[in-house]
Structure formats: structure tokens, C-alpha cells
């Protein structure tokens, strides 16, 4: 399909976020690890996300994405992509933006780290 682009590495963050924001859909193929920064960036850019189905992606996205388990399943998703975008884009992207604001703000993360360090300092020292 001429609308599918494999653009390679893009290291200009502003350009990358612009591409994400104006994309029709974003495939997130990471299958291992924890919270992936590129997934959070795609969520913050308002992307409609199609993600590899694994515990890490589901922990971040919840029900706010479409999931595929194999290359064949991903290809099948493309057959119905127009209907999926029409049905779910506004809902999924809106909820993903809420998750980003609520769970991944620098203020929240800094506060959580501060509380953890305070707790650590209050623990009895042994040895």
C-alpha cells in the first residue's frame, strides 16, 4: 500500500513527533522490556496505536489500542484499519492522553522518587 511508510531512524525529536501526530496509525512492535519510551511518545502524540500483544504493552495501553500477536495478525488488522480508526481513534487517543498526563508527568515521577528516597532515608541502617 502506498500509504504505508517505513521511514527508518528519525533523530530529530520535533520531526518525529510531528510524523507521529499526523500519522493515520502507529505500529508498536516492541515485544520485550518494560515501559517503552517510544510507546509513551506515541501516546502523547495522539497516535492511534496498533501494538504487539504482550504484558508490557498492555500494562501501559490497557484497552486503548488494538493488539496483534503475529505478523499475519498485523496484516489482517490492516484490512479493517479504516473501520477501526473511525470507531476507536477519538476514544483511544483521548484516554491515552489522560494516562500520559496522569501517570507519566515529570512532576508525578519526581514526587514518587522523592517519597521513595525519604522512605529509604528513614529506614534503620544495619552494619
Where are the predicted features?
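Short alpha-helix at the nucleotide-sugar/activated-sugar donor binding site of glycosyltransferases
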Residues: 42-44, 58
Amino acid at each position: 500500500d502506498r500509504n504505508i511508510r517505513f521511514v527508518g531512524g528519525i533523530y530529530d525529536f520535533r520531526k518525529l513527533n510531528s510524523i507521529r501526530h499526523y500519522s493515520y496509525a502507529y505500529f508498536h512492535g516492541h515485544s520485550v522490556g518494560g515501559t517503552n519510551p517510544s510507546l509513551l511518545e506515541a501516546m502523547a502524540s495522539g497516535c492511534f496505536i496498533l501494538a504487539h500483544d504482550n504484558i508490557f504493552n498492555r500494562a501501559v495501553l490497557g484497552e486503548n489500542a488494538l493488539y496483534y500477536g503475529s505478523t499475519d495478525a498485523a496484516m489482517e488488522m490492516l484490512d479493517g484499519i479504516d473501520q477501526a480508526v473511525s470507531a476507536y481513534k477519538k476514544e483511544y487517543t483521548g484516554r491515552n492522553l489522560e494516562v500520559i498526563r496522569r501517570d507519566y508527568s515529570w512532576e508525578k515521577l519526581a514526587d514518587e522518587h522523592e517519597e521513595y528516597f525519604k522512605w529509604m532515608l528513614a529506614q534503620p541502617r544495619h552494619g
